Each structure stands twice: as structure tokens, then as C-alpha cells.
């Protein structure tokens, strides 16, 4: 019988003074706790996804919270029969999710969360436009019905798309979504900072939506791209056939 592997994804925007100093600590902790995956550290916070036993992934998360001083962490856990990562990587980055917009104050400019249970009703209202903030290769295999595809190759291209599509956005309620929520923290903050008032995002992203709602209204169509060896999951969160790497 295969061991049940926990996959923990978490992010937090928190001021880390010397993030480079944490790299050897988490490499050591991860090795001791048999953790595989990726931990990204930057002055603006941390973004991670790693796998191991349920007890060990939570112990590593606890260390992340304690050593960074974070008080607001977005966390998701799901499960697999095998590790979806090959090894542990701890990296220093300029941004924990790269959008390349200077001086974006996520604490001051925040979009409003829409809970997964309320998402279907909200996005089918009049005067609401739905934007998929992910990249085109992700959107190609699955997205929400009627969602706008900005056709970006990287998230750094999203601000330019916003500038080029102001006529589309003006006067609308703007609902955005991404895989796990972190890109929407920045995309909604960007829109709020340049004057859009009614800006919303799916709390916990697609992954939390699928877990909570089971896609009961079939508004999600296709598969969800994920950044690990599974590469894609179905709407019941099981790995999609034919996408696994390194099997």
C-alpha cells in the first residue's frame, strides 16, 4: 500500500529583512524532515509548495511562520500516493511571484475575496467580467466558462495587458482567479492601485474552489495546470492521465 503523501502549498506577504539567511536553515530542516518541493524567499515574503508526511509538512510550515514572523498565511493541503517533487529547492528571489511592478503596496491596495462557495453565483451576475490571470499554456488545458484569457506568456506581461484593455475593464466588476491565489493578490492590488474600485478574487484559487465545491455547476471546464510533476489535475483533484513527469 502506497504511503499517503501530503502536498502543502502556502504563501505570505511579510517583510523579511535578510531572506538569504533562511536558505541554509530550510535546506537543513527539509532534509531532516524528508521534504521535497520548492520554497521561495524574498524581502516581500515566502511562497512554497512541498510534499512529505502530513506531520512533517506542517512542522516545516510552522518553522516558516516562526522564522519569517508571518501572521497572515494562506495554506492549502491535498494528497497524493507519490511525491510530486523530485527534491527540495530553497531559492532567493526578488519577488515571490514575479510581476515586476515596483512599490506595489499589497497591504494598502487589496481586492475583495470571494469565497469558493459564492464564486459561481458572483461570476454569472450582470456587469461582472472574469479574468484568468494565469499564463496561456495553463489556460489552454482548463479555465472557467466565459473567462477572459489575457494570452500572457509570463505574469510580468499582465500589467501591460491591463493598460491595453482599460476600455474593457472600465465600469465593470472585475473578478480574477489563479491556481492558488497568490497571483491574484498582486493582480487585484495592481488594479486597485490604478483606480479600479470593484475588484475581486477567488479566495484560495482554483484548487480551493475545486476542493470546496466539487465543480458542482460545471463552470470549471477542463484540467488545472499545477507546478509539480503531476502537471495537471482533474476537477476531483486527482492527477490527470498522461501528464505525469518522471514516473
Curated annotation (Swiss-Prot):
Enzyme Commission code(s) on record: 1.14.-.-
Active-site residues from the entry: 178 (cysteine persulfide intermediate)
Catalytic activity: uridine(34) in tRNA + AH2 + O2 = 5-hydroxyuridine(34) in tRNA + A + H2O
One Pfam family this sequence matches: Rhodanese
Entry keyword set: Oxidoreductase, tRNA processing
GO MF annotation list: oxidoreductase activity, acting on paired donors, with incorporation or reduction of molecular oxygen
Superkingdom of this protein's organism: Bacteria
GO biological process, one term: tRNA modification
Top-level enzyme category: oxidoreductase
UniProt xrefs under InterPro entries: Rhodanese-like_dom, Rhodanese-like_dom_sf, TrhO, TRHO_N
Domain Rhodanese per the UniProt entry, residue ranges: 124-218
Keyword tRNA processing: yes
Function per UniProt: Catalyzes oxygen-dependent 5-hydroxyuridine (ho5U) modification at position 34 in tRNAs.
Family, as annotated: Belongs to the TrhO family.
Designated name of the protein: tRNA uridine(34) hydroxylase
Source species: Rickettsia typhi (strain ATCC VR-144 / Wilmington)
Amino acid at each position: 500500500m502506497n504511503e499517503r503523501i501530503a502536498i502543502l502549498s502556502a504563501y505570505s506577504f511579510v517583510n523579511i529583512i535578510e531572506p538569504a539567511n533562511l536558505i541554509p536553515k530550510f535546506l537543513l530542516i527539509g532534509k531532516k524532515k524528508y521534504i521535497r518541493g520548492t520554497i521561495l524567499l524574498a524581502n516581500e515574503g515566502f511562497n512554497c509548495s512541498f510534499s512529505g508526511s502530513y506531520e512533517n509538512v506542517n512542522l516545516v510550515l510552522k518553522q516558516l511562520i516562526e522564522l519569517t514572523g508571518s501572521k497572515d498565511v494562506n495554506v492549502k493541503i491535498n494528497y497524493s500516493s507519490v511525491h510530486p517533487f523530485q527534491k527540495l529547492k530553497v531559492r532567493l528571489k526578488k519577488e515571490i511571484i514575479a510581476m515586476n511592478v515596483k512599490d506595489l503596496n499589497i497591504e494598502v491596495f487589496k481586492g475583495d475575496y470571494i469565497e469558493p462557495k459564492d464564486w459561481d453565483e458572483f461570476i454569472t451576475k450582470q456587469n461582472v467580467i472574469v479574468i484568468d490571470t494565469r499564463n496561456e499554456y495553463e489556460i489552454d488545458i482548463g479555465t472557467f466558462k466565459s473567462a477572459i484569457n489575457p494570452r500572457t506568456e509570463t505574469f510580468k506581461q499582465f500589467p501591460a495587458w491591463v493598460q491595453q484593455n482599460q476600455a474593457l475593464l472600465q465600469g465593470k466588476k472585475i473578478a480574477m482567479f489563479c491556481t492558488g491565489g497568490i497571483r491574484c493578490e498582486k493582480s487585484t492590488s495592481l488594479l486597485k492601485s490604478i483606480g479600479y474600485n470593484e475588484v475581486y478574487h477567488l479566495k484560495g484559487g482554483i484548487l480551493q474552489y475545486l476542493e470546496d465545491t466539487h465543480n458542482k455547476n460545471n463552470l470549471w471546464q477542463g484540467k488545472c495546470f499545477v507546478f509539480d510533476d503531476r502537471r495537471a489535475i482533474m476537477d476531483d483533484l486527482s492527477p490527470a492521465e498522461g501528464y505525469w513527469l518522471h514516473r
